[in-house]
A protein has these predicted regions:
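Metal-dependent phosphoesterase signature
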Residues: 44-45, 65-102, 110
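Helix N-cap/coil-helix junction residues
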Residues: 43-45, 71, 134, 165-166
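Substrate-recognition "cap/lid" segment bordering the active-site pocket of phosphatases
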Residues: 93-95, 115, 121-179
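Short alpha-helical
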Residues: 29, 60, 102, 123-124, ...
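Active-site neighborhood of HAD-like aspartate-dependent phosphohydrolases
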Residues: 2-51
C-alpha cells in the first residue's frame, strides 16, 4: 500500500518549491519590511497590502509601490532597501516550515530533481536556503529577478522545469498561496 508521499510523487519527474511560506516561515518578515519601508517614506500601510502583493515578483512589487502607492524611488533602490531590511532576519531569525526538511529528504531519496521557483530576490533566496542548510537539494534556483512576468504567471515554473530537463506537466509544485 502506497503512502501519501508516494502517491503524490507517482509519475512525477521533478519537484519545484516556492521558498517564502513554503520551505521557510518568512511571511511575517515581509509585512514588517513593508511597514518600516512605508513609514520611512511617509506612506500609510493598507490592511490589505500583503494580499495585493501576494504572488507578485519583487520587480512587480516595486512597480506597485511606485505606481499605486506613489513612491518615487527607482526599483533598484527599493530592492536594495528591502534586501537590507530583510537580510539579517533571513540569516538568523527565519526557521524552516514544519515538515519541510522531511519532504526534501524523502524527495531526495526518490532521486527526483528539485528546483526553487520564488518571487524573492536571488540574494535573499540564497541566504534563506544557506541559513537552513538546504541549498544542496536544488539543481535549479529561479528567482523573481530571473523572470519578466512573476507569479501567478506559470513561466517561472515552466523555466525551472525546462532547466531541470523535464516536462512541466510532470512536475509537482509546492506553493503556499493560490497566486503563487
Amino acid at each position: 500500500m502506497k503512502n501519501d508521499i508516494e502517491r503524490l510523487l507517482e509519475g512525477k519527474e521533478a519537484v519545484i518549491f516556492d521558498v517564502d511560506g513554503t520551505l521557510i516561515d518568512s511571511m511575517g518578515v515581509w509585512e514588517e519590511v513593508d511597514r518600516i519601508y512605508l513609514t520611512r517614506h511617509g506612506k500609510p500601510m493598507s490592511e490589505d497590502l500583503q494580499r495585493k502583493l501576494a504572488g507578485l515578483s519583487i520587480l512587480q512589487a516595486a512597480d506597485y509601490f511606485r505606481n499605486v502607492i506613489g513612491i518615487d524611488d527607482p526599483p533598484e533602490k527599493m530592492l536594495a532597501e528591502w534586501n537590507e531590511l530583510a537580510f539579517e532576519q533571513y540569516r538568523h531569525e527565519i526557521q524552516m516550515k514544519p515538515g519541510a526538511a522531511k519532504w526534501l529528504s524523502l524527495i531526495e531519496e526518490k532521486e527526483l530533481p528539485m528546483a526553487v521557483a520564488t518571487s524573492n530576490t536571488r540574494k535573499l533566496a540564497m541566504t534563506a536556503l544557506h541559513a537552513q542548510d538546504i541549498e544542496h537539494y536544488f539543481r535549479v534556483i529561479m528567482t523573481g529577478e530571473d523572470v519578466v512576468r512573476g507569479k501567478p504567471d506559470p513561466f517561472v515554473y515552466q523555466e525551472a522545469a525546462r532547466r531541470l530537463g523535464v516536462n512541466p506537466k510532470n512536475c509537482l509544485v509546492f506553493e503556499d498561496i493560490p497566486e503563487g
